[in-house]
């Protein structure tokens, strides 16, 4: 009989433990709050890849610090559920592969085939693969991401079909039982603001407005009612329009 030994550092799989792809932006912060409401233990993962808006990595720490002292509207103590943060450095690989406006200095506009020049080919596929590899070792079987098909700027790796295909591929390739959660998949940006309010109330909304970062240009010099940003790029436009729609609906 062959004796089996545990793999050093390998945690037992837990489906009430989650790993959130956390960039420091509005969507991933909302997803982190969503996960903290639902799961007993939540860790976060972020990536540096030469992104133009690298200021988002600075926002991550501040957002986590505030969330660690917050509770949800349900009464859940988010601080007791918030676990380790992991940052993986992907170097300049995505810049060399993608040649995107998100990793370079070219204008952000609609390019060939109708895709924005900010599209980084394979980015979410790479992120999910690294996240699953980390989750496999740490026993985290719920992967939570802010991908959205409603306000997704035309990115094909944000589509629901893509995420379902990735879940199948990751589970097959790692012999695991990952569940890829995308709570924003069918929400408009206005509904994402409303979700944040339902999860953490005015305190979470204020945190998102003040500390999260969405602007593709990395602009933190201009403060708008909905947060910081250039106010012109597609990411700022989506965030601003969603905020206005949510405010209008809330006051009706």
Swiss-Prot record:
<feature type="binding site">
    <location>
        <position position="233"/>
    </location>
    <ligand>
        <name>Zn(2+)</name>
    </ligand>
</feature>
<keyword id="KW-0547">Nucleotide-binding</keyword>
<comment type="pathway">
    <text>Purine metabolism; 7-cyano-7-deazaguanine biosynthesis.</text>
</comment>
<keyword id="KW-0671">Queuosine biosynthesis</keyword>
<dbReference type="Pfam" id="PF06508">
    <property type="entry name" value="QueC"/>
</dbReference>
<comment type="function">
    <text>Catalyzes the ATP-dependent conversion of 7-carboxy-7-deazaguanine (CDG) to 7-cyano-7-deazaguanine (preQ(0)).</text>
</comment>
<comment type="similarity">
    <text>Belongs to the QueC family.</text>
</comment>
<feature type="binding site">
    <location>
        <begin position="22"/>
        <end position="32"/>
    </location>
    <ligand>
        <name>ATP</name>
    </ligand>
</feature>
<dbReference type="InterPro" id="IPR014729">
    <property type="entry name" value="Rossmann-like_a/b/a_fold"/>
</dbReference>
<dbReference type="GO" id="GO:0008616">
    <property type="term" value="P:queuosine biosynthetic process"/>
</dbReference>
<dbReference type="InterPro" id="IPR018317">
    <property type="entry name" value="QueC"/>
</dbReference>
<dbReference type="GO" id="GO:0005524">
    <property type="term" value="F:ATP binding"/>
</dbReference>
<dbReference type="GO" id="GO:0016879">
    <property type="term" value="F:ligase activity, forming carbon-nitrogen bonds"/>
</dbReference>
<keyword id="KW-0436">Ligase</keyword>
<feature type="binding site">
    <location>
        <position position="230"/>
    </location>
    <ligand>
        <name>Zn(2+)</name>
    </ligand>
</feature>
<feature type="binding site">
    <location>
        <position position="215"/>
    </location>
    <ligand>
        <name>Zn(2+)</name>
    </ligand>
</feature>
<keyword id="KW-0479">Metal-binding</keyword>
<keyword id="KW-0862">Zinc</keyword>
<keyword id="KW-0067">ATP-binding</keyword>
<feature type="binding site">
    <location>
        <position position="236"/>
    </location>
    <ligand>
        <name>Zn(2+)</name>
    </ligand>
</feature>
<dbReference type="GO" id="GO:0008270">
    <property type="term" value="F:zinc ion binding"/>
</dbReference>
<protein>
    <recommendedName>
        <fullName>7-cyano-7-deazaguanine synthase</fullName>
        <ecNumber>6.3.4.20</ecNumber>
    </recommendedName>
</protein>
